[in-house]
């Protein structure tokens, strides 16, 4: 038995916490994660960018990055010009995965050049979301929906 280092990100927060779990048994790991998440026993735990909840054998793992959320799925709406598209994602999905889906959407009719410039922003804001961040980071606590705007604005020069 070896220690497992777990990076825990809780829905609606911008930072994560590291916890060292002295067991690689799934039940012990989930209990430690849920304690950090402070969302109770009904909290769902996902490995980063995974669609399914954390399960299986962790014995051979030395580190793990997880997302803790009250949501099993997040209903994501992406708006572009006067159109909107919707899809359910795991709370552990990254902004990059949502961006690839939205920019590649047939509804928005983006060519390859436009897809390369595309970014996601929160409505009413000006800064693009970090592509490696998870969608759970932008949730209002315990709400299982997220609205994002797709923009083609150039952010490379500030």
Language-model segment annotations:
Residues 1-158:
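Ubiquitin system architectures
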């Amino acid at each position: 038995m070896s220690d497992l280092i777990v990076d825990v990100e809780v829905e609606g927060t911008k930072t994560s916490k590291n916890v060292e779990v002295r067991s690689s048994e799934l039940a012990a790991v989930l209990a430690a994660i849920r304690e950090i998440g402070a969302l109770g026993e009904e909290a769902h735990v996902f490995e980063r960018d995974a669609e399914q909840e954390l399960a299986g054998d962790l014995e051979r793992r030395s580190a793990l990055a997880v997302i803790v959320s009250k949501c099993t799925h997040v209903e994501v709406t992406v708006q572009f010009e006067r159109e909107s598209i919707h899809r359910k994602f795991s709370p552990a999905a990254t902004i990059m995965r949502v961006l690839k889906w939205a920019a590649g959407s047939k509804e928005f009719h983006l060519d390859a050049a436009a897809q390369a410039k595309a970014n996601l922003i929160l409505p009413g804001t000006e800064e693009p979301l970090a592509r490696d961040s998870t969608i759970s980071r932008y949730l209002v606590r315990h709400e299982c929906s997220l609205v994002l705007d797709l923009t083609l604005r150039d952010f490379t020069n500030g």
